[in-house]
UniProtKB/Swiss-Prot annotation:
One of its GO terms (biological process) is translation. It catalyses: L-glutamyl-tRNA(Gln) + L-glutamine + ATP + H2O = L-glutaminyl-tRNA(Gln) + L-glutamate + ADP + phosphate + H(+); L-aspartyl-tRNA(Asn) + L-glutamine + ATP + H2O = L-asparaginyl-tRNA(Asn) + L-glutamate + ADP + phosphate + 2 H(+). Pfam families: GatB_N, GatB_Yqey. The gene is gatB. Heterotrimer of A, B and C subunits. Its EC number is 6.3.5.-. Allows the formation of correctly charged Asn-tRNA(Asn) or Gln-tRNA(Gln) through the transamidation of misacylated Asp-tRNA(Asn) or Glu-tRNA(Gln) in organisms which lack either or both of asparaginyl-tRNA or glutaminyl-tRNA synthetases. The reaction takes place in the presence of glutamine and ATP through an activated phospho-Asp-tRNA(Asn) or phospho-Glu-tRNA(Gln). PROSITE patterns: GATB. Belongs to the GatB/GatE family. GatB subfamily. Keywords: ATP-binding, Ligase, Nucleotide-binding, Protein biosynthesis. Gene3D superfamilies: 1.10.10.410, GatB domain, N-terminal subdomain. The keyword Nucleotide-binding applies. GO terms for molecular function: asparaginyl-tRNA synthase (glutamine-hydrolyzing) activity; ATP binding; glutaminyl-tRNA synthase (glutamine-hydrolyzing) activity. This is Aspartyl/glutamyl-tRNA(Asn/Gln) amidotransferase subunit B.
Length: 492
């Protein structure tokens, strides 16, 4: 895959005291592999167990214990590489990354330095304004996670929990192709969506399933790359955006004051809204990488890769294109619906056999709006796809108006029930009897002669009469019939 260079976008430049600056961002995403067992042992990867409950002798680095590769972790890495349109390397190797820390019992981390399992790929990212851009993927490699040091249980002691030690991670390294905090957030959101579609990572940042190291530098437009600082272990998409903004501003202020940027690793403090120095940024030679003598090169057969490829699910980009073609959706609506696999599946159940646009409008505007208000998603939704589909059908058949549909949806959401039965039981059918509608209109016209004169001079005031008639009919008047009668009676 050929490298590409993004042209400077004037809209994304940051204004400094002495002129404009361009921020350049690269990401290293640590995605926990969805697997029942760890990368080199059979210990469980279950989240939330008692401390040191999921630790094998291999994880604890007991003498004489040798690592054995977990085939499912390898398969998950290959699936991810295929989903990123990346090169799958049939031969890769494991290396020891040497550093000392209490929660790293081996004294080194098994990783892939020289020969990763996945090479160059790409992610296509869509922004809310309709802009799309490509983020190049430099590599994906497998590595072990470390344990967890706990410092707040005692004023004098630190504790180590090795439950996470040895859990398989995929480190997905992007090229420095991002040019704003908005782009970085959109990239991580899209990457997480791809991983979830593939089933290779849960992407739950609250549980540490997905963590980001964010590399930030600034430069004058058109100049060479500046010195980068790495912001370590950012654990939410919102914090990623905030960390980039404050770090870019920090670097700009230093450079404009005549200072220089030190290449270092920093931490983001969301409470103070600042980054602070953690340590000088290590280079590869600081880790003294060398091939792990306990692990043979990982050699894959092409048939193995092809078998995995043949069973890949439909991914967000392909699903979005299909939704646009098959259901006539706008690119924006299609993007919203395919952002999560569960959401896309829910929509397709609603849209099956009926107007796709009408289904999308109701799902996005009514269902998602209500779920977001309550902090729920389609998995925990109290309204089933069949119930939403029934409401969409009732609107399409002219049985209820769009306004009544909102009220009906609220009843189904809070109380449950069959929408068609509820319409009958609660008298929610819209009034299509033109005689009844004319009676309501006549009463409103008779009571408001001043408004009649105004609407005849200014036809846009018709909406006031529509609102009064809808109010008088309890929202049940057929909108088209009502509009026709009003225009005829008012002579407009």
């Amino acid at each position: 895959m050929t490298a590409h260079v993004r042209p400077t976008d004037a809209k994304k430049l940051i204004k400094g005291a002495t002129g404009n600056w361009e921020v350049v961002i690269g990401m290293e995403i640590h995605a926990q592999v969805s697997s029942n067992a760890k990368l080199f042992s059979g210990a469980s990867t279950a989240f939330g167990g008692p401390p040191n409950d999921h630790v094998s002798l291999v994880d604890a680095a007991m003498p004489g214990m040798l690592p054995v590769i977990n085939k499912e972790c390898v398969a998950q890495a290959v699936r991810t590489g295929l989903g990123l349109r990346a090169q799958i390397n049939l031969r890769s190797t494991f290396d020891r990354k040497n550093y000392f820390y209490p929660d790293l019992p081996q004294g080194y981390q098994i990783s892939q330095y020289k020969s990763p399992i996945v090479g160059e790929g790409e992610v296509i990212v869509d922004l809310l304004d309709g802009e799309s851009f490509v983020v190049g993927i430099e590599r994906l490699h497998l590595e072990q996670d470390a344990g967890k040091s706990i410092h707040d249980l005692s004023p004098t002691l630190s504790f180590v929990d090795l439950n996470r030690s040895g859990v398989a991670l995929m480190e997905i390294v992007s090229r420095p192709d991002l040019r704003s905090s908005e782009e970085a957030r959109a990239y991580v959101t899209k990457l997480r969506s791809i991983l979830r579609y593939l089933g290779t990572c849960d992407g739950d940042m609250e549980k540490g399933n997905l963590r980001a190291d964010v590399n930030v530098s600034v430069r004058r437009p058109g100049e060479p790359l500046g010195t980068r600082c790495e912001i370590k272990n950012v654990n939410s998409i919102r914090f990623i955006g905030q960390a980039i903004e404050v770090e870019a501003r920090r670097q700009i202020e230093i450079l404009e004051d005549g200072g220089v940027i030190d290449q270092e690793t920093r931490l983001f403090d969301p409470n103070k809204g600042e980054t602070r120095s953690m340590r000088s940024k290590e280079e590869a030679h600081d880790y003294r990488y060398f091939p792990d003598p306990d692990l043979l090169p990982l050699v894959l057969h092409a048939d193995f890769v092809e078998e995995l490829k043949s069973h890949l699910p439909e991914l967000p980009d392909e699903k979005k294109a299909r939704f646009i073609a098959d259901y006539g959706l706008s690119p924006y609506d299609a993007s919203v619906l395919v952002a999560e696999r569960d959401t896309a599946d829910y929509f397709e159940q609603v849209a099956k056999g009926r107007d796709g646009k009408a289904a999308a409008n109701f799902v996005i505007n009514e269902l998602f709006g209500r779920l977001n208000k309550d902090g729920k998603d389609v998995i925990t939704s109290p309204v089933s796809p069949a119930q939403v589909a029934a409401i969409v059908d009732l609107i399409g058949e002219g049985v209820i108006s769009s306004k009544i549909a909102k009220d009906l949806f609220e009843i189904v959401y809070t109380e449950g029930g069959d929408p068609r039965v509820l319409v009958e039981e609660r008298g929610l059918k819209q009034v299509t009897d033109t005689g009844a509608i004319e009676k309501v209109v006549d009463e409103i016209i008779a009571a408001n002669p001043d408004k009649v004169a105004q609407v005849q001079a200014k036809p846009t005031m018709l909406g006031w009469f529509v609102g009064q008639a809808m109010k008088a009919s309890g929202g049940k008047a057929n909108p088209q019939a009502l509009n026709d009668i009003l225009k005829r009676k008012l002579g407009i």
